[in-house]
């Protein structure tokens, strides 16, 4: 443990300071902006008119949309209850329209609009002219607007998304029979990209095999040097030109480690793919624990030296090799098994419409529990999440859309599926995080013809070492297995002993017993016993059947498998919504708000205690966590999760014992520490009936349960529990993970309210309703109609989603119980700040703030004197409440005696 780093954190917190925030970055249409005068990415998310229905003629430039709602993107068309499974979301056409006046300075430039994702099939018009029709929900749409724009006057972009069921494009399966939800809308970012008529193309805007944009790959990698190959596709829409292509590669510290210049002549209205290569000496290599990213600067100049295009890409120098029974080799060296989870992108209430910071926090929350591989179930993820995986050192299994469906009747379905294969590789080929290409629809009976073409197209798009395709290793696909590099299975496959194995989904215990009941599927509010059961199931699940011992795919099974199985992903990281089933999937180690369950700490026990200094926001520190609440309904056994060597458990000041967190009979590096039959509710009652609420040292020593984490014989961390007492107050936490909210009109910050006792213990068994209000440069998402505000406490928690305005500044969040009273818990307030966006926002109008409910005691027009008197009265009421509560406590003590 780095004690100096830990001490610095404590000192900074004591003096009200913060550690300097790591500046995470998000790509824009596949690049990072350097000089906006040459190539600029303009944030086009703010100020779209929207209506959730079909409207005839809404593509026309003069259509009257004045009564439509104004929204900011990403937008999912609607807000939904926490439990939104079973197809409760809207399916059908909707419309978005944006009015804008292009800057006169853009005359003569190329102007592209880049949609990161529109759900379903969609049509896009500019000034009444149809410019693109698209079929598919998860890939960018890159459209040239240059010839359609009118400068000096208002322009209108109209978009008609339609998320209705449609068998003709992937995933193809109707939502009501699908194990995830479509949701809808323009649910990812939109960018306006401007550059000159000589420019580096976008790989999805040009149909070039292994071409378009920038393509980087590596060869001859050692610790001493690596050969870097860079292909740059340049378009020239002007006169023939002699050009210079400049490359500069810089390391994390900004040191230039290589540079290169190449001359090329491109004819008028033509393009050229320029192939370049150079050697980097003593390269900083990318790996999960050391995710070094280099900056590749690409600059196009004319023969006079004028810059015509410039931007940068992030490059992670690494090679992967899968050697079947020998396992995974990263940068030429054997690498340990990878362990992680699948990820669906939907979030509580907002569906798929997550802003970039929420995507980043998703990746960060998983990385902070030690995960180093993610499977993108069952579609390609938002670029912000992919950027985070590159940055945080998380391998990724990239998947095309699909789930248990193949359209045999319409050939267009396979054509579009194969187009998705090419698009996925073109889009993500440069990412160091990409581990496998899942180019088949999940759990689907696809024809052999498709297997041949899908693997062939992948090889064509990535014709270099390090490309690995993957499919299921099931009997009905035995003919197709030979075409793929990797198989999904529990362990080595007898018929394919030389193939590498990956476990795509493990942990979920589905046998269709009474319609998908499973020990893995636990809603957090069900309590500690179900949560403990879920965690222990994920660790190891065995049972007897017909006289034979059966083992379900678990953490124990994964670590105990042969070297052929080089990685595995849990189903699933977060609770998420489903189409065909009315219950959400509750098997996540975190809920839909990304708040942890006990199983979260099972995974965190695999986090090392040092060695992650190069991973942003991730501290490899010792921890210990007691998965027990000391309630009258708590189990007798006490389970503790830790990444320390040993755990010492003390109860009521008496030592229970010391146990190791390792087991010579278990292949898992850390095991749950279980102290059996040590908790008795009568002891908790007797030890706490007097003096409770003082929270002084004497009481703490005599009343709590304490776990101490031990490394090399010394206590390095601890965690305490006590029986939660009377509800005293609400407590608020801004769950920003150290990622500063952006004032871009789209960012969402999670604020969690906890109901706690006098000492801060959370009252997990409470179910009051909590009402949130927001002041300043933010707005509360949702209200009564969508069951968001007020909100019932679940497991002692209520969560507010706060959307940033377009002005940087202070945001104040207040939480209070719905019904006031002399003995009601005290309200809570917390503040946080937003910072200005990194890109220019282009808009002409803003959404109106939703009308918030004003609590009765808060008078809208009250004077400063009245406000002062009201505050004083509240303080008097609070003191009176404390007095009464203490008197009640004394009476109870007397009665017990």
PLM feature spans:
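Accessory beta-strand-rich segments of carbohydrate-active enzymes
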Residues: 26, 30-35, 54, 91-207, ...
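Substrate-binding/catalytic cleft of secreted carbohydrate-active enzymes
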Residues: 361-365, 373-601, 619-627
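Beta-strand-rich structural segments
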Residues: 230-233, 299-300, 638-642, 747-764, ...
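Extended acidic/polar, glycine-enriched regions
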Residues: 150-154, 231-323, 832
């Amino acid at each position: 443990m780095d004690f100096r780093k830990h001490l610095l954190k404590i000192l900074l917190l004591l003096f009200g300071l913060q550690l300097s925030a790591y500046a995470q970055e998000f790509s824009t249409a596949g690049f990072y902006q350097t000089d906006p005068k040459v190539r600029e990415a303009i944030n086009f998310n703010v100020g779209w008119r929207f209506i959730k229905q079909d409207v005839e003629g809404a593509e026309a430039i003069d259509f009257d949309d004045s009564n439509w709602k104004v929204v900011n993107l990403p937008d999912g068309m609607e807000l939904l209850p926490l439990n939104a499974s079973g197809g409760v979301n809207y399916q059908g056409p909707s419309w978005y329209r944006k009015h804008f006046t292009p800057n006169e300075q853009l005359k003569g430039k190329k102007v592209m609009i880049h949609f990161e994702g529109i759900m379903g099939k969609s049509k896009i018009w500019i000034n009444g002219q149809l410019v693109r029709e698209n079929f598919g929900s998860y890939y960018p749409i890159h459209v040239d607007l240059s010839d359609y724009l009118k400068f000096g006057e208002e322009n209108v972009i109209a978009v008609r998304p339609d998320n209705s069921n449609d068998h003709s494009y992937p995933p193809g399966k109707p939502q009501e029979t699908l194990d995830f939800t479509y949701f809808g809308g323009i649910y990812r970012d939109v960018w306006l990209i401007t550059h000159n008529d000589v420019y580096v193309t976008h790989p999805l805007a040009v149909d070039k095999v292994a071409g378009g944009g920038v393509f980087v790959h590596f060869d001859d990698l050692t610790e001493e040097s690596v050969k870097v190959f860079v292909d740059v596709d340049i378009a020239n829409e002007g006169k023939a030109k002699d050009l210079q292509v400049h490359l500069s590669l810089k390391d994390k510290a900004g040191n230039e480690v290589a540079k290169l210049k190449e001359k090329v002549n491109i004819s008028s209205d033509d393009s050229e793919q320029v192939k370049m290569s150079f050697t980097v000496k003593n390269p900083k290599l990318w790996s999960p624990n050391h995710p070094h990213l280099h900056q590749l600067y690409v600059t196009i100049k004319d023969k006079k030296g004028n810059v015509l295009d410039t931007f940068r890409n992030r490059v992670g120098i690494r090679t992967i090799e899968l050697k079947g029974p020998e396992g995974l080799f990263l940068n030429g060296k054997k690498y340990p098994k990878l362990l992680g989870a699948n990820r669906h992108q939907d979030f509580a209430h907002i569906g798929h419409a997550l802003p970039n910071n929420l995507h980043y926090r998703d990746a960060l929350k998983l990385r902070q529990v030690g995960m180093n591989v993610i499977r993108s179930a069952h579609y390609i993820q938002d670029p912000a999440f992919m950027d985070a995986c590159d940055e945080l050192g998380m391998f990724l299994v990239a998947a095309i859309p699909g789930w248990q469906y193949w359209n045999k009747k319409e050939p267009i379905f396979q054509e579009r599926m194969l187009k998705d294969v090419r698009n996925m590789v073109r889009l993500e080929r440069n990412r160091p995080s990409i581990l496998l290409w899942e180019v088949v629809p999940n759990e689907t009976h696809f024809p052999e013809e498709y297997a041949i073409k899908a693997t062939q197209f992948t090889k064509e798009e990535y014709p270099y070492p390090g490309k690995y395709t993957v499919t299921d290793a099931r009997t009905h696909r035995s003919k197709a297995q030979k075409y793929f590099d990797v198989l999904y299975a529990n362990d080595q496959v007898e018929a394919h002993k030389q193939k590498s194995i990956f476990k795509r989904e493990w942990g979920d215990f589905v046998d269709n017993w009474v319609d998908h009941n499973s020990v893995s599927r636990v809603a957090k509010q069900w309590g500690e016993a179900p949560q403990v059961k879920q965690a222990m199931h994920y660790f190891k699940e065995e049972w007897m059947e017909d006289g034979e011992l059966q083992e379900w795919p678990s953490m124990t099974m994964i670590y105990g498998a042969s070297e052929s199985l080089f990685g595995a992903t849990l189903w699933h990281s977060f609770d998420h919504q489903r189409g065909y089933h009315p219950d959400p999937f509750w098997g996540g180690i975190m809920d839909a708000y990304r708040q942890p369950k006990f199983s979260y700490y099972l995974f965190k026990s695999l986090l090392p205690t040092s060695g992650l200094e190069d991973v942003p926001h991730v501290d490899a520190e010792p921890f210990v966590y007691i998965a027990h609440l000391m309630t009258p309904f708590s189990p007798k056994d006490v389970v503790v999760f830790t990444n320390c060597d040993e755990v010492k458990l003390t109860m009521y000041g008496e030592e229970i014992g010391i146990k190791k967190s390792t087991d010579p009979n278990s292949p898992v590096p850390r095991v749950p520490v279980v102290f059996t039959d040590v908790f008795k509710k009568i002891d908790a009652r007797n030890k706490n009936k007097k003096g409770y609420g003082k929270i002084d040292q004497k009481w703490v020593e005599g009343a709590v349960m304490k776990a101490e984490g031990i490394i090399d014989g010394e206590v390095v961390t601890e965690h305490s529990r006590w029986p939660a007492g009377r509800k005293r107050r609400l407590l608020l936490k801004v769950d920003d993970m150290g990622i500063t909210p952006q004032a871009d009109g789209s960012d969402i910050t999670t604020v969690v309210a906890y109901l706690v006792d006098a000492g801060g213990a959370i009252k997990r068994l409470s179910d009051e309703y909590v009402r949130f209000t927001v002041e300043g440069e933010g707005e509360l998402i949702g209200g009564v109609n969508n069951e968001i505000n007020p909100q019932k406490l679940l497991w002692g928690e209520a969560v507010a989603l706060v959307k940033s305005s377009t002005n940087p500044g202070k945001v104040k969040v207040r939480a209070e119980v719905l019904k006031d009273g002399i003995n009601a818990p005290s309200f809570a307030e917390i503040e946080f700040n937003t910072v200005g966006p990194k890109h220019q926002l282009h808009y002409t109008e803003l959404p109106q703030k939703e009308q918030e409910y004003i609590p009765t005691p808060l008078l809208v027009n009250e004077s400063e004197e009245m406000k002062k008197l009201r505050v004083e009265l509240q303080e008097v009421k609070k003191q009176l409440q404390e007095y009464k509560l203490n008197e009640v406590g004394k009476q109870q003590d007397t009665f017990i005696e």
